Amino acid sequence: MANHKSAEKRARQTIKRTERNRFYRTRLKNITKAVRVAVEAKDLNAANEALKVANKSIHSFVSRGFLKKQTAARRVSRLAQLVNTLKAA
């Protein structure tokens, strides 16, 4: 239990940030999984659509400060690589 007003505020902020980060983390996992599932099913159209959604979402996470720019670039690059394996096959 916080004894100071500022500590109470920090506790509230921590709860808010934790919930927000959990939401972003879950969303990131789900959009990544959608791309991987489409690739495993060998569905090029679905994989491209999922990649487009993933790209947009991941870069929006950067603008919100959830991910660093390079981390987002790496994740998008790896997903694009996965989708390109379908095009090559």
Swiss-Prot record:
GO MF terms held by the record: small ribosomal subunit rRNA binding; structural constituent of ribosome
InterPro entries per UniProt: Ribosomal_bS20, Ribosomal_bS20_sf
Family annotation (Pfam families): Ribosomal_S20p
Keywords assigned by UniProt, alphabetized: Ribonucleoprotein, Ribosomal protein, RNA-binding, rRNA-binding
Cellular component GO terms, alphabetical: cytosol; small ribosomal subunit
GO biological process, one term: translation
Region called Disordered, residue ranges: 1-20
Domain of life: Bacteria
Role noted for this protein: Binds directly to 16S ribosomal RNA.
Family: Belongs to the bacterial ribosomal protein bS20 family.
Descriptive protein name: Small ribosomal subunit protein bS20
Organism, as annotated: Campylobacter concisus (strain 13826)
Gene name tied to this protein: rpsT
